[in-house]
């Protein structure tokens, strides 16, 4: 876990990524509370609320909305936790629509190589599935999870995987964030 050089950066964004129903929102909220920092909710939840279907244009609009919401909050804060970012949206897009999107790939690359450092917490789907209207499939979580490490590695992203109980996840995640902040 390479620490962030606070003198030479404009803050830190910690994105919580993983398959659906793998504890991303719970962890983002807990980290925000622990570090007294803001968190950016998953944009797709508001965008898709009350809808029964979506298409590729919707997923790209969600990506743009997630990115803009994150930028607005990050501009005013040194530390920000993000519940889902373009890594999740890229995997969702590629699985759902069967291929890459050049804009999405370029935006993801730009976010990873921006002046503001970005680190990742990858949540393991080792917790029970909880149904809700926006979740699509309780049985594909392991297969989706298997896509994250190779993508994060390919992108050269710095990440820590978290698993286990809420307490174990929070303990591992806070340790990672402290290491990244050099605290």
Please give the residue ranges for each predicted region.
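Pre-Walker A adenine-sensing motif
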Residues: 1-7
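Hydrophobic anchor at the beta1->P-loop junction of P-loop NTPases
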Residues: 16
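Pre-Walker A (Motif I) flank of P-loop NTPase domains
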Residues: 9-13
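Conserved nucleotide-sensing/catalytic segment adjacent to the nucleotide-binding pocket
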Residues: 53-101
């Amino acid at each position: 876990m390479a620490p962030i050089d606070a003198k030479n950066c404009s803050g830190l964004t910690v994105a919580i990524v993983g398959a659906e129903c793998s504890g991303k929102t719970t962890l983002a909220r807990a980290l925000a509370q622990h570090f007294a920092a803001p968190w950016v909710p998953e944009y797709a939840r508001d965008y898709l609320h009350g809808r029964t279907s979506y298409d590729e244009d919707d997923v790209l609009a969600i990506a743009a909305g997630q990115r803009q919401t994150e930028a607005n909050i990050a501009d005013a804060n040194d530390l920000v936790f993000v519940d889902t970012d373009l890594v999740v949206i890229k995997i969702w897009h590629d699985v759902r629509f069967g291929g890459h999107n050049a804009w999405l790939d370029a935006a993801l690359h730009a976010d990873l190589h921006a002046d503001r450092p970005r680190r990742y917490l990858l949540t393991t789907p080792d917790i029970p599935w909880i149904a809700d209207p926006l979740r699509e499939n309780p049985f594909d979580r392991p297969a989706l999870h298997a896509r994250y490490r190779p993508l994060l590695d390919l992108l050269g992203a710095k990440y820590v995987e978290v698993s286990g109980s809420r307490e174990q996840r929070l303990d591992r995640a806070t340790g990672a964030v402290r290491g990244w902040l050099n605290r």
